[in-house]
């Protein structure tokens, strides 16, 4: 009875495992791309950076506005005074109390700074464009990584299928070798070799299954899925056989997001250089203030000291700051900005050159693989027939 219960439990567990495997949802390439656009951490981080650029740009006009600051303060004194004048007169008083209140409102309006504020406003707008381009670039890279990882799983599944088919052939060879040996028509080394080949394929199957699980975990990370998420992928890789290299080369400069980001960095470096050159010019500011002060002395020892004093009023004027010598700091900053501009231009040219080389190499590999598909399929079918039928011509026994 116990044996029957154990067998029943084993059978039930096996059925549940089979159902669980078959119940894994199908993940299409479109769903994988949609998932990475929604949950990919790299894209989310760059969106946060782009939001920061947009926030800074929304306050860009503030550079043209005046600055207004208010200050106030109150001081109360309790002093003991002892004075001796030149004529010999002595004055002395204790616990002399006084109070002072000061309040001011100051305005400073920068009206000219070598047009630096205008350049900065444009620069902030260009940073918003850079943020959008970096997001697009990351989206393209993330989608490419997802597609590569997804179809690598498909490729490894096809490899696993080939291994399983080879295992079936090896199992058939083992059976045939056992039959031939049992009737005295075969040799034991042939049987041993067939078993060795079968065991080798079993080991290859385990290795391949592990590799598929590892690649799936890589895809889970790209998609933002939880570790161990189960799903199935497609069984084939679609191939576009109508790609023309001239079309790809012609649109790369204006559509390749990596090149567009590099070009935008050149624009920002040029604006930074203009900002630094503006520091050579004087700055002109309009200034104004409203001041209020009040002093209250409860007692004095000098008869000419007022017991109460109050002043208030409005003033205005203009302030000019002319840079004369600042230890060559502006010159150094201009040279640094020029070096950065040169670097960004070289980087763009390098990326443009590298992109052209990468497109050329990828297209050559694409042409090679496209030409090899038919030959590989024919060779595989021929090999499969030979393995199925050992007596077919071309089989070496």
Predicted features along the sequence, with ranges:
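Periplasmic alpha-helical coiled-coil/stalk elements that build and connect Gram-negative outer-membrane
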Residues: 55, 141-253, 365, 369
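Amphipathic alpha-helical coiled-coil segments
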Residues: 45-60, 138, 142-161, 215, ...
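Small/polar, glycine/serine/threonine/aspartate-rich low-complexity segments that form flexible
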Residues: 71-109, 234-241, 274, 287-322
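Soluble, cytosolic/nucleoplasmic coiled-coil alpha-helices used as oligomeric scaffolds and tethers
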Residues: 56, 63, 70, 77, ...
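Bacterial Sec-pathway N-terminal export signals of envelope proteins
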Residues: 23-73, 79, 187, 227-270, ...
């Amino acid at each position: 009875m116990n044996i029957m219960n154990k067998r029943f439990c084993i059978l039930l567990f096996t059925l549940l495992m089979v159902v669980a495997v078959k119940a894994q949802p199908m993940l299409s390439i479109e769903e994988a791309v949609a998932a990475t656009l929604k949950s990919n951490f790299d894209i989310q981080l760059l969106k946060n950076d782009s939001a920061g650029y947009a926030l800074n740009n929304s306050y860009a006009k503030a550079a043209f506005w005046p600055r207004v600051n208010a200050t106030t303060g109150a001081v109360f004194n309790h002093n003991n005074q002892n004075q001796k004048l030149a004529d010999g007169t002595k004055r002395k008083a204790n616990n002399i109390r006084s109070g002072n209140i000061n309040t001011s409102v100051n305005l400073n309006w920068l009206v000219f700074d070598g047009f630096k504020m205008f350049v900065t406003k444009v620069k902030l707008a260009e940073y918003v464009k850079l943020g959008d381009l970096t997001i697009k670039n990351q989206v393209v890279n993330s989608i490419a990584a997802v597609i590569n990882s997804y179809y690598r799983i498909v490729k490894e599944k096809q490899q696993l299928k080939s291994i399983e088919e080879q295992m079936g052939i090896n199992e058939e060879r083992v059976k045939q070798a056992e039959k031939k040996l049992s009737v005295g028509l075969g040799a034991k080394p042939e049987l041993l070799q067939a078993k060795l080949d079968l065991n080798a394929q079993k080991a290859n199957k385990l290795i391949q299954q592990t590799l598929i699980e590892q690649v799936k975990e890589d895809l889970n990370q790209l998609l933002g899925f939880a570790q161990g998420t189960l799903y199935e992928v497609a069984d084939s890789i679609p191939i576009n056989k109508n790609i023309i290299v001239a079309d790809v080369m012609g649109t790369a400069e204006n559509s390749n997001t990596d090149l567009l980001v590099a070009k935008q960095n050149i624009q920002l470096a040029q604006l930074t250089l203009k900002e630094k050159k503006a520091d050579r010019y004087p700055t002109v500011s309009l200034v104004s203030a409203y001041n209020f002060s009040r002093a209250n002395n409860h007692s004095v020892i000098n008869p000419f000291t007022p017991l109460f004093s109050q002043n208030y009023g409005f003033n205005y004027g203009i302030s000019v700051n002319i840079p004369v010598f600042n230890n060559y700091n502006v010159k150094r900053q201009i040279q640094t900005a020029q070096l950065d501009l040169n670097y960004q231009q070289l980087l763009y040219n390098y990326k443009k050159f590298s992109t052209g080389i990468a497109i050329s190499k990828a297209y050559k590999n694409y042409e090679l693989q496209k030409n090899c598909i038919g030959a590989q399929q024919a060779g595989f079918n021929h090999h499969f027939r030979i393995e199925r039928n050992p007596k077919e011509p071309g089989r070496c026994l």
